[in-house]
């Protein structure tokens, strides 16, 4: 009896897909199933074993590398209580055949560069993530060999691997005396904006060639400013790289910004750093702490913090938490003004901190000494006479 091809994940997500192809012995074929997981180390919107809804699979005959089916879409079935994925058209095992299944998500037409999929590898030439952080995508690939004899009951175990590095940036503050308004974020001077990917379906290992890459800045301007006020009933922490994850960046090594003040003798070292578009105000007081020329809560300037490591590895998620309880970083070493035509940060002018300098100095404090009271000896008053005793002797009456 013919059985439709479908995919099922017992513990996580099913992640394969198929298009209809001829079979040599459909009378004895059984259902093809998959039990798949997404690698734990993982954007924009990261893909996990829990949230994956769609996947696309290509299948090849292991014997000659010819295609059995290409780019079949599977969608997670609803209302079943299981992670079962239903294909757009059924597919069947062929007795005696061994297949190479290659799965990707999202669909190849939505990748920055559409991948080329063969039995032995997946390749993408000059793949460059979008420069707007929330437009970036988490890209995953997985491959496995399977036969009906070994997998017609329990399904095929298939693991999908993240091929990018994820950079998640979040902030926190428990200082209820300062209000921070954050309008945007940048990851500045990332070393390589693109690379050529080669993913081996034999060992599920990815390699990146970054020779053609150039420096790039990734950014995101928020629809509404994020306000941190440090109060128990207010907002004390927030994610800046999108609610569903972080920036998705080509894995690479890089030189971090050295965090030093920029001068003619010590110029900016061209390193990578994180920058926030920020407005800072003390709760008590009428002036703004940053930018120096702020005219209200809608005046912003860029502040910076150095990235604390020098490498982002494939499949790793890096979470940077910026604690702003006692400070907000340094003046951006390159472009501190939101609008250079109407500068309000004015680094190094009228006593303002220069590029690369701390925005907050040390906490203002005082070493207090109270002058002791002077206590001249005025004698004692004799209440019987209303006179003052001098040297403990009764005063003479006038």
Report each predicted region and the residues it spans.
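Sec-type signal peptide cleavage vicinity
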Residues: 2-398
């Amino acid at each position: 009896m013919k059985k439709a091809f479908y995919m099922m994940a017992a513990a996580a997500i099913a992640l394969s897909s198929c298009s209809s192809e001829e079979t040599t012995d459909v009378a004895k074929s059984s259902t093809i199933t998959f039990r798949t997981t997404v690698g734990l180390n993982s954007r924009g919107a990261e893909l996990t074993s829990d949230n994956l809804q769609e996947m696309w699979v290509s299948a090849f005959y292991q014997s000659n590398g010819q295609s059995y089916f290409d780019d079949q879409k599977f969608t997670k079935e609803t209302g079943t209580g299981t992670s079962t994925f239903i294909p757009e058209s059924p597919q069947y095992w062929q007795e005696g055949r061994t297949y190479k299944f290659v799965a990707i998500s999202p669909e190849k037409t939505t990748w920055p560069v559409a991948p080329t999929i063969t039995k032995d590898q997946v390749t993408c030439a000059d793949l460059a993530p979008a420069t707007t952080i929330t437009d970036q995508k988490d890209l995953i690939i997985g491959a496995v060999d399977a036969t009906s004899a070994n997998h017609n009951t329990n399904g095929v175990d298939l693991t999908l691997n993240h091929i990018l590095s994820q950079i998640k940036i979040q902030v926190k503050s428990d200082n209820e005396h300062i209000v921070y308004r954050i309008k945007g974020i940048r990851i500045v001077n990332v070393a390589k904006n693109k690379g050529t990917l080669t993913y081996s379906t034999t060992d599920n290992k990815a390699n990146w060639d970054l020779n053609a890459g150039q420096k790039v800045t990734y950014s995101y301007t928020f629809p509404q400013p994020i306000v941190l006020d440090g109060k128990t009933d207010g907002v004390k922490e927030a994610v800046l790289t999108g609610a569903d994850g972080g920036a998705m960046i080509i894995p690479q090594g890089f030189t971090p910004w050295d965090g030093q003040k920029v001068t003619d003798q010590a110029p900016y070292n061209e390193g990578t750093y994180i920058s926030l578009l920020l407005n800072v105000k003390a709760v008590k007081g009428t002036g703004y702490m940053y930018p120096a020329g702020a005219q209200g809560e809608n005046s912003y300037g860029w502040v910076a913090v150095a990235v604390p490591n020098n490498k982002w590895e494939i499949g790793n998620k890096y979470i940077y938490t910026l604690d702003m309880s006692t400070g907000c970083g340094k003046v951006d070493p390159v472009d501190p003004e939101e609008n250079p035509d109407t500068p309000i940060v004015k680094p190094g002018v009228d006593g303002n901190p220069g590029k690369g300098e701390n925005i907050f100095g040390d906490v203002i404090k005082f070493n207090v000494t109270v002058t002791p009271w002077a206590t001249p000896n005025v004698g004692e008053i004799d209440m019987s006479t209303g006179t003052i005793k001098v040297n403990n002797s009764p005063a003479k009456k006038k």
